[in-house]
């Protein structure tokens, strides 16, 4: 069985579109689990009513919004206990499957590779670029510490932060910056890569991971650095992870956060706060491995 876990927040139409992109593939033996992260506009309850009587779609109404990792972990735990699937595909509600015979290709890759985690080719329709893998190296402690200190300084509202927010509100400039970053990394998205940080908008977990791990993502973060932390944990535990261009999805980016934060300054402040907290969690994970080894 393949289970799709979709984290929902606010934008009902996008979640329905995501579900339809899965159902249109007419795959056998699948289940779709929608996790509503306590949407204040009642869209979670509306989805619950919309899919009532649909045996393929479960809608979970979370009693809090504790962010990306926590919401997905709720879906992961529920799915693991109820369905015990061969694969879990955790995806944003703004992601659509693009590959034909997605399930068959997934099983073929697994039969050959026996991976714990796989990241598909994720193409951002918003910025017209490939997003996974995010880079080709694991993060180091000094690198994360430097980021943590940088985000700590960025929590204050300064002239620089206002200027940065203004620049990010320009679609052309923002797209140019994102595309330039990707080009500078010199990643060939047509190649297979092993044990690299993957993009979090679509992550595929095999039974090898599911049988061993209680959580899909390290608890404690709200947004950002979830897959970077996951990459580090898998690296330390010697779990095989991979990027495969055989499986493709489309990412219509930032739909939920754009609904909540239509003001770019507020969105940037929120992002800096989350980045600071997430890098703090990342540092604690690294320190724990340094102190205790891999048996955690």
Tell me what each language-model feature is.
Residues 188-189, 196-215, 219-247:
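A short, conserved alpha-helix in the catalytic core of glycosyltransferases
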């Amino acid at each position: 069985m393949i289970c799709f876990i979709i984290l929902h927040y606010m934008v009902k139409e996008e979640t329905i579109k995501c579900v339809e992109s899965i159902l249109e593939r007419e795959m056998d033996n699948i289940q779709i689990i929608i996790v509503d992260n306590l949407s204040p506009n009642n869209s979670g309850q509306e989805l619950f009513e919309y899919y009532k009587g649909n045996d393929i779609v479960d809608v979970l109404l979370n009693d809090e919004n504790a962010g990306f990792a926590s919401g997905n972990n709720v879906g992961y735990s529920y799915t693991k206990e109820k369905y015990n699937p061969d694969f879990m595909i955790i995806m944003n509600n703004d992601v659509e499957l693009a590959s034909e015979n997605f399930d068959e290709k997934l099983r073929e890759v697994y039969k050959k590779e026996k991976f714990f985690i796989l990241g598909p080719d994720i193409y951002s329709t918003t910025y017209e670029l490939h997003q996974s893998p995010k880079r080709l190296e694991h993060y180091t402690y000094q690198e994360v510490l430097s980021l943590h200190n940088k985000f700590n300084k960025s929590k204050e509202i300064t002239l620089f932060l206002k200027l940065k927010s203004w620049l990010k509100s320009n679609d052309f400039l923002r797209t140019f910056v994102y595309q330039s970053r990707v080009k500078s990394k010199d990643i060939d998205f047509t190649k297979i890569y092993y044990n690299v940080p993957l993009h979090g908008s679509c992550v595929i977990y095999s039974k090898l991971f599911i049988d061993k791990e209680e959580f899909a993502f390290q608890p404690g973060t709200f947004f950002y650095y979830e897959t970077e932390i996951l990459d580090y944990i898998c690296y330390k535990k010697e779990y095989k992870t991979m990027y495969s261009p055989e499986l493709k999805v489309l990412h219509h980016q930032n739909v939920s956060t754009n609904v909540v934060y239509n003001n770019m300054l507020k969105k940037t402040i929120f992002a800096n706060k989350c980045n600071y907290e997430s890098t703090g969690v990342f540092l604690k994970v690294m320190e724990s491995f340094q102190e205790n080894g891999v048996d955690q």
